[in-house]
């Protein structure tokens, strides 16, 4: 468990990696379906509860159980009519049901214990509903109904039961998903792809052509729609967006892909998540050099340079603020297959300090000269950079070479681009210039630490690779 997290979910693949002398990798995916495990913290405050936890530590290891996934709650989108089989749900939570054959429905769950809970078997999923095998003979209302997916699992050997007083105890219970068939899958559009909806900045780019959405701009560009919004007491920006078919329903705290990065580059996906800089160690960088140390233990030693490339390992902690962000992270990890596939990820730090802006038709970026230019000159790996701007845009450039140049008696670093720039970016508009590294996950396991049913954090670690060569 990480920090104060009470619920932990883990997905784990298995990848065999063969590394050649020059650092190139050949990766073999040996597990097609990831192992899935859960950890829940249970607190017992009565003798009965404490004895129940004690009993759970002594059960036969071969016993199987269905457990609710408490962090994957699903909500009704409309009231349920009795004698029906279709539960129409909020589709934001559809992916929570992936692979589940059974569900548990809590109705009017309150401290007075006047509610009930029902267990039902799933027949299939549609784009907006759970279709049950048997009907439910009572009405249910979306305001006081919760649906939890059930998974068949075994209970892993438990840690020690911790007593806090004579009648109270605590235990972290670890459950291992048995991954038994049949597994009922949600529709493919929920199962595989990013569930993005419309982003505010995508609508801004497509509708108002990158103009700032100031009040004066909206008044001038869309006077009729602006007046309609004011007359109805609505936010003009929201009203105008919806008039063009946009749904301002998914903004992910306004920080998920806030720099409008593309989804792919050079045929590889781009990871949009970025560090949140909450803790002092929120992001880190370690560097692996491809060398051998030759040491005969007599005192003298030398290093044998396999190649002049170094390999960065980027690690950072990121938070996911709603269910779509959490599920997008899981989907991305599954598409990568753990360490198997490579993808692009920005370093999210200032790797270069620009001296002047980027000019249209030019293929050079002048920066402050640092000692790292010596490393750049010897590194033979092709790299890319991404320029983040203060108006939340991003521009990717391939680097052809590095050089230095003396201008007016002062030396500057010079990034030589593979192509001439097709845009002018003034220096005062640049937020930072980061490397866009081609990486893979450095671990086959993804561990999500939940702070609420739709809020989680994860620490990602990614190692630079040479796949593009």
Show where each model-derived region lies.
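Extracellular/virion structural assembly segments
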Residues: 1-128, 134-469
């Amino acid at each position: 468990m990480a920090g104060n997290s009470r619920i932990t979910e883990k997905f784990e693949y298995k990848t065999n990696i063969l590394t050649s002398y020059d650092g190139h990798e050949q990766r073999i995916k040996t597990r097609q379906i990831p192992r899935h495990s859960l950890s829940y913290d249970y607190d017992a405050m009565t003798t009965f509860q404490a004895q129940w936890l004690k009993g759970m530590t002594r059960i036969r290891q071969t016993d199987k159980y269905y457990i609710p996934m408490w962090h994957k709650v699903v909500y009704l989108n409309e009231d349920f009519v009795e004698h029906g089989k279709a539960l129409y749900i909020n589709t934001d939570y559809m992916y929570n049901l992936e692979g589940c054959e059974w569900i548990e429905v809590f109705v009017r769950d309150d401290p007075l214990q006047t509610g009930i809970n029902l267990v039902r078997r799933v027949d299939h999923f549609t784009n907006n509903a759970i279709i049950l095998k048997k009907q439910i003979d009572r009405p249910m209302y979306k305001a006081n109904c919760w649906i939890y997916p059930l998974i068949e699992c075994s209970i892993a050997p438990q840690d020690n039961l911790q007593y806090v007083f004579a009648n109270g105890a605590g235990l972290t219970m670890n459950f291992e998903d048995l991954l038994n068939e049949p597994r009922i899958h949600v529709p493919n559009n929920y199962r595989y792809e990013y569930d993005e909806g419309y982003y505010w900045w995508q609508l801004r780019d497509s509708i108002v052509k990158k103009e700032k959405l100031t009040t004066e701009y909206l008044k001038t560009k869309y006077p009729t729609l602006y007046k309609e919004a004011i007359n109805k007491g609505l936010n003009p920006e929201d009203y105008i967006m919806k008039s063009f078919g946009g749904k301002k329903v998914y903004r992910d705290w306004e920080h998920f892909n806030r720099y409008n990065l593309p989804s792919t580059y050079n045929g590889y996906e781009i990871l949009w998540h970025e560090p949140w800089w909450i803790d002092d160690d929120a992001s880190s960088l370690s560097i692996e050099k491809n060398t051998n140390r030759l040491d005969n233990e007599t005192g003298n030693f030398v290093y044998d340079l396999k190649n002049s490339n170094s390999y960065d390992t980027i690690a950072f902690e990121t938070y996911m603020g709603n269910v779509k962000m959490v599920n997008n992270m899981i989907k991305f990890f599954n598409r990568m297959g753990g360490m198997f596939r490579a993808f692009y990820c920005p370093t999210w730090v200032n790797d270069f300090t620009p001296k002047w802006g980027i000019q249209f038709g030019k293929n050079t970026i002048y920066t402050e000269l640092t000692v790292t230019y010596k490393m750049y000159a010897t590194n033979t790996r092709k790299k890319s950079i991404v320029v983040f701007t203060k108006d939340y845009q991003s521009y990717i450039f391939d680097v052809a070479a590095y050089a230095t140049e003396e201008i007016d008696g002062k030396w500057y670093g010079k990034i030589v681009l593979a192509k001439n720039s097709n845009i002018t970016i003034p220096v005062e508009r640049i937020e930072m210039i980061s490397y866009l590294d081609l990486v893979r996950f450095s671990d086959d396991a993804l561990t999500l630490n939940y702070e609420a049913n739709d809020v989680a954090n994860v620490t990602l670690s990614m190692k630079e690779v040479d796949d593009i060569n």
